[in-house]
Amino acid sequence: MAVAGFVFCWPLLGLTIVLLVAPIDAAQRHTASDNPSTYNIGGVLSNSDSEEHFSTTIKHLNFDQQYVPRKVTYYDKTIRMDKNPIKTVFNVCDKLIENRVYAVVVSHEQTSGDLSPAAVSYTSGFYSIPVIGISSRDAAFSDKNIHVSFLRTVPPYYHQADVWLEMLSHFAYTKVIIIHSSDTDGRAILGRFQTTSQTYYDDVDVRATVELIVEFEPKLESFTEHLIDMKTAQSRVYLMYASTEDAQVIFRDAGEYNMTGEGHVWIVTEQALFSNNTPDGVLGLQLEHAHSDKGHIRDSVYVLASAIKEMISNETIAEAPKDCGDSAVNWESGKRLFQYLKSRNITGETGQVAFDDNGDRIYAGYDVINIREQQKKHVVGKFSYDSMRAKMRMRINDSEIIWPGKQRRKPEGIMIPTHLKLLTIEEKPFVYVRRMGDDEFRCEPDERPCPLFNNSDATANEFCCRGYCIDLLIELSKRINFTYDLALSPDGQFGHYILRNSTGAMTLRKEWTGLIGELVNERADMIVAPLTINPERAEYIEFSKPFKYQGITILEKKPSRSSTLVSFLQPFSNTLWILVMVSVHVVALVLYLLDRFSPFGRFKLSHSDSNEEKALNLSSAVWFAWGVLLNSGIGEGTPRSFSARVLGMVWAGFAMIIVASYTANLAAFLVLERPKTKLSGINDARLRNTMENLTCATVKGSSVDMYFRRQVELSNMYRTMEANNYATAEQAIQDVKKGKLMAFIWDSSRLEYEASKDCELVTAGELFGRSGYGIGLQKGSPWTDAVTLAILEFHESGFMEKLDKQWIFHGHVQQNCELFEKTPNTLGLKNMAGVFILVGVGIAGGVGLIIIEVIYKKHQVKKQKRLDIARHAADKWRGTIEKRKTIRASLAMQRQYNVGLNSTHAPGTISLAVDKRRYPRLGQRLGPERAWPGDAADVLRIRRPYELGKPGQSPKVIATNQPGMPMPMLGKTRPQQSVLPPRYSPGYTSDVSHLVV
């Protein structure tokens, strides 16, 4: 069903297509049928031959079906060109416009002037009738505001500027002087050259610049004033546009100034080529088919027929105007026909025929003419259309050219000046700058005067320069024979480009500063300085071959050996020291606890009557732990228990390892060589990682700065370091020495010099961004090749190596640095001062502690004296009390005795009670319960309670130290004051048994 439906739709689709196409085809047939079938082509020609050829060409055209549609016929209407432009205007109106001409072909004699063709163009253009010129080459006809409908099959004179550019590129001339008249054509050719050169040199390597523009008034009488300016210029290539008459004057005066001979190059336009005094060797241009009116007539007719044919097929053509008196006529078809004409591109008898927006012929061919002896013109090249590449191509046979002075060898095109303006910049060690003293009038023999460039302050210009580049300059000037004036950079910078608005312009343009800016603006001839060769600079200036190859590297300060007061603590980190200190006291505490609580911690020798040894106290444990750690002798206070002794052995092993490690590491820190760098190079992660606390920088606007901008992989790093960049390299190097900047990225030559001069600085990593230092010159400078060859000779002869050793590496200084690095380090007071200070602190601590102990002891003695006085007073008081008690007791006992004696015993005998208690020996301490009252020293005083008298006498009561003890009363003798024997009397007895009287 689907297939059947699809087949059913085919007739309907076919009917739809027929209905849609039929109106279009009908409209086309209607348009073609509405267009005129006959077309009159007017001709304003200069002679009868041209008129006849014009008529014949149109007749032949009617039989050419390629250009003429069916039922279309062309007719010619011609008039003779009149020298009177007014009469020409009337003839155009009466004989051409009245006959409804659709276009007009115009030619005239080259010597008759362009007023008549202009009159035809004005008249026809007023009615929008296209005009095709075949001989008018003035620039005025390119102005479409005046000649609104004018085309031409010949190019204007100022189009020769395009050929000039091709010739300059072929001969590799980079500087030219343009000579032109001040009329419209002269200024047009200058404008064409300047405009075209801006886009032309994008595709070629050699760029030509205009050094001098000489403009003169037509109808010259003398050209000598301009020749004086031209003679002082550097360029010797002259591009001249002048009429034949003016060219004669210019060549005459130039010959008198010897400016048409050897070394000079003249390239002129067609008019000047026909001067009767054109010098030998002049190169000129001549338009191909320039005088072939018949060829141009045929090409113009066929171009017109081609445009009308296309217009007929696309739109309706209204009839041409018929009455010159009708000023209201506005022929739109004529305007449209003019646009069709400009779009034509055909191959005709005069070559490839095409037009630009102004209606001027493009792709016109030229012959390159070389003037020989006796004004003979010899074709040495062609500028023609290349159909394969669809563009114009220059072909010149250099071997056939005879140059001015009858030379076969191409001139250099420039005058090489022998006195140059040189610029330099202060950059150690390449250029040292010294201000002259007030009493100095000249520089040293190895120095050269170098005032500030373009500085009017006389006092600020007194500088002398020396160094690597100055020695190179002195030798270079001798080798290639030039003199110079040396000056310092006006702003102290190498130069970088900035984008700046031009006055009255909407676009930004690059502008160079510093040394490069002076060279680009041609205020200096050469830069002799450590100028890095890079693509940005090479686009605007010339460079010699490098006189020193180098790259980019990193400067940093060497890691210092920390010779501080606590340098002896460096082998261990702070954390490790803290752990060791904690371990000492923890082990001491554990030793004390193990020895305290161990059941086997206290022991005594077998069969020994001595008391058991005491356990290890905390103080002794700390002393033991420190003694083992510091490897000092342990005389007392060692652990007693087995468990504590095991821990002590382990602690001794720990102490041995710690002390050995400390000793070895201390030697490594204080004696062995330190690491040279912190960074491994540009690829170090710390440089790439923007989060690291590491500052790096370069000099802003320098070649290194440009390098980082170009490198995409370094963009993150550049954004970080951009804010830290310095104005000069000197400032950055000083900050590296002070430790304010960790890494300075700069040219390796300068940094190697700084590292060789200061042993504390070192370059890190390998070179990157390799380039070289070159001598800068102006674009197209004649000195470029000579300077390059001289530098290559210097490399071969070893002169550059000599400069490296003398100025950069500082041989003796570098050897001293290497000796310093290789010699083992000797420890001095600076390294070990902390240890001595530690001993001093120990001594001071000991003295301080003994002072504290003395003060404390004095305080204790005073306190003890007060206690002794109080105790003595208490003892005396206690003795008095005891004495009274004893007397009372004695009296009471005597009374009892007297009573008992009278009642029981016989007189003359007494029975004394015996104290059976054990008394301590002399000097033995007793407990408080055994102390005798009044004995301050707690030493037992034993006295005899009774002293027996002689036989027949009654015994005397001496004393009693025991309250309540019965005292014998001997008779009625009254007790007298007791007489106490001295303490520790040898008459002491420890036992009293019986006393018998």
Swiss-Prot record:
Q: Which residues lie on this side of the membrane: Cytoplasmic?
A: 595-651, 853-997
Q: Where is this region: Disordered?
A: 970-997
Which membrane topology describes this protein?
A: Multi-pass membrane protein
Pfam families named among the record's database cross-references: ANF_receptor, CaM_bdg_C0, Lig_chan, Lig_chan-Glu_bd
What's this protein's function? NMDA receptor subtype of glutamate-gated ion channels with high calcium permeability and voltage-dependent sensitivity to magnesium. Mediated by glycine. This protein plays a key role in synaptic plasticity, synaptogenesis, excitotoxicity, memory acquisition and learning. It mediates neuronal functions in glutamate neurotransmission. Is involved in the cell surface targeting of NMDA receptors. Plays a role in associative learning and in long-term memory consolidation.
Gene name in the database record: Nmdar1
Q: Name one GO biological process term.
A: long-term memory
Q: What is this protein called?
A: Glutamate [NMDA] receptor subunit 1
Q: Where does glycine bind?
A: 530-532, 537, 703, 747
